[in-house]
From Swiss-Prot:
Pfam families: YcgL. HAMAP family: UPF0745. It comes from the Bacteria. This is YcgL domain-containing protein KPN78578_22820. Residues 1-85 form the YcgL domain. Gene3D superfamilies: YcgL domain. It comes from Klebsiella pneumoniae subsp. pneumoniae (strain ATCC 700721 / MGH 78578).
Length: 93
């Protein structure tokens, strides 16, 4: 199984995985509008692979077979104030 990964032009660190190059037929229109013009990032073989860097391999495979796409969102931003206060033994309000 192969997938094609596209980078969003509207949302930083957001990627769309599809089964075939330039085939967005199974991706909802609303998602495509909010994603922007897809920029191809890479073609990736999924078979024989044990893991992906920022996505769960099994979830990607399942989403591709069931819905035809997988959307990878950026990791949540770190709350530096909360982290600093935790290190100081305090709580933020």
């Amino acid at each position: 199984m192969f997938c094609v990964i596209y980078r969003s032009t509207k949302r930083e660190q957001t990627y769309l995985y599809v089964e075939k190059k330039d085939d967005f037929s199974r991706v909802p229109d609303e998602l495509m509008r909010s994603f922007g013009t897809p920029q191809m990032a890479m073609l990736l073989p999924l078979d024989g692979r044990k893991k992906l860097v920022n996505a769960d391999l099994e979830k990607v495979k399942q989403a591709l077979s069931e819905q035809g796409y997988y959307l990878q969102l950026p990791p949540p931003s770190e709350n530096l104030l909360k982290k600093h206060l935790a290190e100081q033994g305090k709580q933020s309000d």
